Amino acid sequence: MKIIQRSDGKFFATYTTRTKFGDWMAQNLFRTGMTLREVAGKLHVSRVTISEHLNGRHNPTFRDVVAYCWLFGNIDDPNDIYKLVKEES
């Protein structure tokens, strides 16, 4: 996982492997004390998908990475999720 700062000062993350992404996400879940249900509710995804991410069986998309970054405080405005996804695509 690599956190990158854009020219406007906002932060987002890139990832190299599914395992590293799962490790990073698991650490953040542990740090925040949130449950899978709470995270799923915030991101509007299923708990099964999150479990697959954590176990490295689900290949995260750029949208997933940005959404998790916003959830865990790396991005200030949720609208940046969509801006970053557009920039990447």
Identify the meaning behind each predicted range.
Residues H44-P60:
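Recognition helix of helix-turn-helix/homeodomain-like DNA-binding domains
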Residues K42-V45, F72-G73:
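A short, basic/aromatic helix-end/turn motif that makes direct DNA contacts
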Residues L36, R47, F62-V65:
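Helix-turn-helix DNA-binding elements, focusing on the entry/boundary residues of the two helices
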Residues R63-N79:
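DNA major-groove recognition helix of helix-turn-helix/homeodomain DNA-binding modules
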Residues M1-T35, K42:
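A short, Lys/Arg-rich alpha-helix, primarily the initiator
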Residues N79-S89:
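Short amphipathic recognition helices of helix-turn-helix/homeodomain-type DNA-binding modules
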Residues M25, V39-A40, I50-H53:
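Conserved hydrophobic/aromatic packing and binding residues within compact polymer-binding modules
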